[in-house]
């Protein structure tokens, strides 16, 4: 069986934050949805990464793993697993997709246009992955990845887009992303801001500097009209 530290590409002395960063990077790289032409290998790698993260991110499981030795860990280990270990043959690991969703706060990171979508004819922005090819796993936990772009929209109108993403130190609960897009529509300056934080999506639309609509998780909020 593979050494879980080697699977995540970290040292046996890696900190919990190192484990999170490694999982974030590899899970995004090997998620089956990102590898449609190599799905079988991707599923295998994704499962390995998930199992490694499940064990090494839990201090108790990691301690048992370190004491038992990676070569005697679970998956048919039977008698090779120490009697004191709660993990025997056929240990029920969690569904890799459940771990992935939980890590990203219930959000689908591949749905964000700025994640790694290049410019298209509609003026969508380069993704953060394009700016930082190594992926989020290389980021310090407190660091923001910023990208700002300008392009021409249809009909010669201008459009600018700004996006940012940041991760706190607690994995999913520390995730926040902001995407702001401004374009001219019929002579009016329309700015749309999309904020995703702690599993909640908020979309604000401004027209010539005045807030026109607010939508939270797909439901439009009533706006107060000042007389």
UniProtKB/Swiss-Prot annotation:
> One MF term from GO for this chain?
Hsp70 protein binding
Q: Which UniProt keywords apply?
A: Chaperone
How does the record describe its quaternary structure? Answer: Interacts with histone deacetylases HDAC4, HDAC6, and SIRT2, HDAC activity is required for antiaggregation.
Keyword Chaperone among UniProt keywords: yes
The keyword Oxidoreductase is annotated on this UniProt entry: no
GO cellular-component terms in the record? cytosol; nucleus
Q: What is this protein called?
A: DnaJ homolog subfamily B member 8
PROSITE patterns attached here? Answer: DNAJ_1, DNAJ_2
What the entry says about domains is: The antiaggregation activity resides in the serine-rich region and the C-terminus.
Function, as annotated, reads: Efficient suppressor of aggregation and toxicity of disease-associated polyglutamine proteins.
Please list the residue ranges annotated as the J domain: 3-69
Which one GO biological process term can you cite for this protein? negative regulation of inclusion body assembly
Classification via Gene3D superfamilies: DnaJ domain (1.10.287.110)
Taxonomy, superkingdom: Eukaryota
């Amino acid at each position: 069986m593979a050494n879980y530290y080697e699977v995540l590409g970290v040292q046996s002395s890696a900190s919990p934050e190192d484990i999170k960063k490694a999982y974030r990077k590899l899970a995004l790289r090997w998620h089956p949805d990102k590898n449609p032409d190599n799905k079988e290998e991707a599923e295998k790698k994704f499962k390995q990464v998930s199992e490694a993260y499940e064990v090494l991110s839990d201090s108790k499981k990691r301690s048992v793993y370190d004491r038992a030795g990676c070569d005697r860990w679970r998956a048919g280990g039977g008698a090779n697993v120490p009697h004191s270990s709660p993990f025997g043959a056929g240990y029920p690991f969690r569904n890799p997709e459940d771990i992935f969703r939980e890590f990203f706060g219930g959000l689908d990171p591949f749905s964000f246009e700025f994640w790694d979508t290049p410019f298209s004819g509609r003026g969508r922005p380069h993704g953060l992955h394009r700016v930082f090819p190594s992926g989020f796993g290389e980021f310090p936990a407190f660091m923001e990845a910023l990208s700002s772009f300008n392009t021409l929209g249809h009909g010669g109108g201008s459009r600018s887009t700004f996006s940012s993403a940041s991760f706190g130190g607690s994995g999913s609960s520390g995730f926040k992303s902001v995407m702001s897009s401004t374009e001219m529509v019929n002579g009016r300056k329309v700015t749309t801001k999309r904020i995703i934080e702690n599993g909640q999506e908020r979309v604000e639309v401004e027209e010539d500097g005045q807030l026109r609509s607010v939508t939270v998780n797909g439901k439009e909020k009533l706006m107060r009209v000042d007389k």
